[in-house]
């Protein structure tokens, strides 16, 4: 049930009018200065208003009923951003959550950030754009050169091919890359095509690939990868089945290019599978925390995930093979609690500064 009426604002003498909305027996009072929520507590709670601009597909996978219900109980209100109205005319928002593409939208967000510095934008458009090009995506990991007592984290050797497929075999030879090679589209825009992979077993077949693309040396990893979800300071790791290992015999016998769909997301979870313990063991928590903290700073992002593999036959040699902004959190266990806690911490931190 929804009610609208004018009431006096008890939180701030400056306020005169506010909108009262009753949803599922939870009273939400909204105005420009003092949004509050009263869910039967002795004192009202301040509402954290999250404006969201997401694709239809993302809304369906992310804004699930359980998330919205939990958010409402915690005093978080999700509000859809109207793309037909100026963003500055909407809100007020405490947080803007987005995953849309296009230069026009990026400019809208940049202008909004400049005119509304009090609003947390998740995440800065320029920082997100950095991950859309696989030529630069993994550079932050390579620059870290992370190595400590818990393990070593690197990236596979790779080569960027922007044009001229016929020249690929020669370029691969000059770069000294070792077969087999994984071919990925250069642009990582979240489309189905951007997640397609090809595995090339011999040099001659390389000229059948379609630039622009990135070639990465394939690292045997027991057919399992680790998806490391990062939400602010929180980290959650799940196992996924991946491409199977390639033996020397297979490399000598197989030819051509094998194409795969989106491997890690299409595959079933490997968490409950009967796996070799040396393959299934999760990366050390301290190593992941160090990696995530450093990447949050280097990338300027708070919502992303890493695809990590362990080199087969080793216990502590890891490779980051992909980074995705605002991934499919709906596949992350307990994402509703983790995400709402994160949004709440951002909102509370904002009000404490006032």
UniProtKB/Swiss-Prot annotation:
Tell whether Methyltransferase is among the UniProt keywords: no
The EC class name is transferase
Could you say which tissues express the protein in this record?
Answer: Seed specific.
Instruction: Spell out the reaction equation it catalyses.
Output: 1D-myo-inositol 1,3,4-trisphosphate + ATP = 1D-myo-inositol 1,3,4,5-tetrakisphosphate + ADP + H(+); 1D-myo-inositol 1,3,4-trisphosphate + ATP = 1D-myo-inositol 1,3,4,6-tetrakisphosphate + ADP + H(+); 1D-myo-inositol 3,4,5,6-tetrakisphosphate + ATP = 1D-myo-inositol 1,3,4,5,6-pentakisphosphate + ADP + H(+); 1D-myo-inositol 3,4,6-trisphosphate + ATP = 1D-myo-inositol 1,3,4,6-tetrakisphosphate + ADP + H(+)
Per UniProt, where does 1D-myo-inositol 6-phosphate bind?
57, 99, 190, 195, 227, 229, 305, 324, 328, 331
**Sites where the protein binds Mg(2+) 2:** 322, 324
- Give the superkingdom in one word: Eukaryota
What's the EC number here? 2.7.1.134, 2.7.1.159
Q: Which family does it belong to?
A: Belongs to the ITPK1 family.
Q: What is this protein called?
A: Inositol-tetrakisphosphate 1-kinase 3
In its UniProt entry, the species of origin is given as Glycine max
Query: What is the name of the gene encoding this protein?
Result: ITPK3
